[in-house]
From Swiss-Prot:
<dbReference type="InterPro" id="IPR000043">
    <property type="entry name" value="Adenosylhomocysteinase-like"/>
</dbReference>
<feature type="binding site">
    <location>
        <begin position="197"/>
        <end position="199"/>
    </location>
    <ligand>
        <name>NAD(+)</name>
    </ligand>
</feature>
<feature type="binding site">
    <location>
        <position position="318"/>
    </location>
    <ligand>
        <name>NAD(+)</name>
    </ligand>
</feature>
<dbReference type="GO" id="GO:0006730">
    <property type="term" value="P:one-carbon metabolic process"/>
</dbReference>
<feature type="binding site">
    <location>
        <position position="230"/>
    </location>
    <ligand>
        <name>substrate</name>
    </ligand>
</feature>
<dbReference type="GO" id="GO:0071269">
    <property type="term" value="P:L-homocysteine biosynthetic process"/>
</dbReference>
<feature type="binding site">
    <location>
        <begin position="260"/>
        <end position="265"/>
    </location>
    <ligand>
        <name>NAD(+)</name>
    </ligand>
</feature>
<protein>
    <recommendedName>
        <fullName>Adenosylhomocysteinase</fullName>
        <ecNumber>3.13.2.1</ecNumber>
    </recommendedName>
</protein>
<dbReference type="InterPro" id="IPR036291">
    <property type="entry name" value="NAD(P)-bd_dom_sf"/>
</dbReference>
<feature type="binding site">
    <location>
        <position position="283"/>
    </location>
    <ligand>
        <name>NAD(+)</name>
    </ligand>
</feature>
<feature type="binding site">
    <location>
        <position position="231"/>
    </location>
    <ligand>
        <name>NAD(+)</name>
    </ligand>
</feature>
<dbReference type="GO" id="GO:0033353">
    <property type="term" value="P:S-adenosylmethionine cycle"/>
</dbReference>
<dbReference type="InterPro" id="IPR015878">
    <property type="entry name" value="Ado_hCys_hydrolase_NAD-bd"/>
</dbReference>
<feature type="binding site">
    <location>
        <position position="226"/>
    </location>
    <ligand>
        <name>substrate</name>
    </ligand>
</feature>
<keyword id="KW-0963">Cytoplasm</keyword>
<feature type="binding site">
    <location>
        <position position="196"/>
    </location>
    <ligand>
        <name>substrate</name>
    </ligand>
</feature>
<comment type="similarity">
    <text>Belongs to the adenosylhomocysteinase family.</text>
</comment>
Length: 471
């Protein structure tokens, strides 16, 4: 990796890739009407003026459009990726040359990853962020865990239970040695965080229940125009993209096992079926299991499916969904991958420590493990996000939905003083995000008459559904 060494505040793989990145950003802007509409709406108004935003979210071409939207709205932005493999190096370079501090490159070590997260939380002169755009909750967690260890430095003695926690604690110890009240000062200045993904939202609610949340949060993930589009339709396209770029495998005729049938699992199951695979679903939730069965998918347990599958995809947000014992039983040449946020859905660490398997790297983010009996499996992206580790993530259009929500959430947090808690954007904004994307794909909306609106008890201009409505 070539580290750029100039007066600019960044660390990327290769700054010479900036021109390539800019060309792709220009293309992406045409596919992201929501973000471009927000730029036009607030042109000259700078609703985020004075804000300091730390972004911990995949540093892709689409994210570059989000970053430049936040900057155009007046924010001071620093950015890192939320996954060691998800950065598109040309996107990072293109943003870095504009003067936005970026700390991201594809293939970071865990130590480098947490160093990058540390950099985005430091705006100089003792200042931290007052807003965070988070994906998975790592930037939020660094502040909250740092706050806890400042109250109880004996936590450093434990040092973390796995490689990732050890890398995080090493950064926190370094910061503590420099300033033992750093995170108390940062937390006191925070206006809030907007969280992108299911896993990060679970973390927020868990911290709220334990009384550990230190600042307000907006749950962007559960906006309908995020979860029912990014999670579902985004995964429907990007999963197959990741698998095919990594393996060149023919999906038709294979047995694909999709673990989990939430919004992400639904997109993945339909993706694999659309390519001609026979799809088996595993689920813990009876409602989701019934949905899968009613869609025509076989629903069974992993213990039953493990000997049938040729492709295994975890989508659950839970840990140890595919165990070492499962991988020992898989058919020869099985492909194993994850599209949930963290790498602990698959027991990759126990697999790497297992003496009965040998590891051979085929190419970046593709590893072959051969077991004692001679059968092998292919692990993609080291069990991390396959669509970003082995491909380029979701298409621009669907990410425009998600990132429009993120931008609106940042404006909402900056302009208003929320109590500590986890909030959602109102239905009217959800509908507005959808409305901004209709013209791009040729949609013509029917308009209610006043009499029709009165008859069903809604305003002519919406919102059209109650808050509890399930789309």
């Amino acid at each position: 990796m070539t580290i750029a060494a100039t007066a600019l505040d960044y660390k990327v793989a290769d700054i010479s890739l900036a021109e390539w990145g800019r060309k792709e950003i220009d293309i992406a802007e045409k596919e992201m009407p929501g973000l471009m509409a927000i730029r036009n709406k607030y042109k000259g108004q700078k609703p985020l003026a004075g804000s300091r935003i730390s972004g911990s979210l995949h540093m892709t071409i689409q994210t570059a459009v989000l970053i430049e939207t936040l900057v155009e709205l007046g924010a001071d932005v620093r950015w890192a990726s939320c996954n060691i493999f998800s950065t598109q190096d040309h996107a990072a370079a293109a943003i870095a040359v504009t003067g936005v501090p970026v700390f991201a490159w594809k293939g970071e070590s865990l130590e480098e990853y947490w160093w990058c997260t540390r950099q985005i939380l430091d705006f100089g002169n003792g200042l931290g962020p007052n807003l965070i755009v988070d994906d998975g909750g790592d930037a939020t967690m660094m502040i909250i865990l740092g706050y806890k260890v400042e109250n109880n430095p004996s936590m450093f003695d434990k040092g973390g239970s796995n490689a990732e926690e050890k890398a995080l604690f090493a950064q926190l110890k370094s910061i503590y040695d420099e300033d033992s009240t750093r995170w108390h000062k940062v937390a006191a200045d925070m206006k809030g965080v907007s969280e992108e993904t299911t896993t990060g939202v679970h973390r927020l609610y868990h911290m709220m229940e334990k009384g550990e949340l230190l600042f307000p949060a907006i749950n962007v993930n559960d906006s309908v125009t995020k979860s029912k589009f990014d999670n579902l339709y985004g995964c429907r396209e990007s999963l197959a993209d990741g698998i095919k770029r990594a393996t060149d495998v023919m999906i038709a005729g294979k047995v694909a096992v999709v673990l989990g049938y939430g919004d992400v699992g639904k997109g993945c199951a339909h993706s694999m079926r659309s390519y001609g695979a026979r799809v088996i679903v595993t689920e813990i939730d009876p409602i989701c299991a019934l949905q899968a069965a009613m869609e025509g998918f076989e629903v069974t347990t992993m213990d039953r499916a493990v000997k049938e599958g040729n492709i295994f995809v975890t989508t659950t947000g839970n840990k140890d969904v595919i165990t070492l014992e499962h991988m020992k039983q898989m058919p020869d040449e099985a492909i194993v991958c994850n599209i949930g946020h963290f790498d602990n859905e698959i027991q990759v660490e126990p697999l790497n420590e297992y003496k009965g398997a040998t590891k051979l790297n085929i190419k970046p983010q593709v590893d072959k493990y051969t077991f004692e009996d001679g059968h092998c499996i292919y692990m993609l992206a080291e069990g991390r996000l396959v669509n970003l580790g082995c491909a380029t993530g979701h298409p621009s259009f669907v990410m425009s939905n998600s990132f429009t929500n993120q931008t609106l959430a940042q404006i909402e947090l900056w302009k208003n003083d929320y109590e500590i808690g986890v909030y959602r954007l109102p239905k009217a904004l959800d509908e507005e995000v959808a409305r901004l994307h209709l013209e791009q794909i040729g949609v013509k909306l029917t308009t209610l008459s006043k009499e029709q609106a009165d008859y069903i008890g809604v305003p002519v201009s919406g919102p059209y559904k109650p808050e509890h409505y399930r789309y």
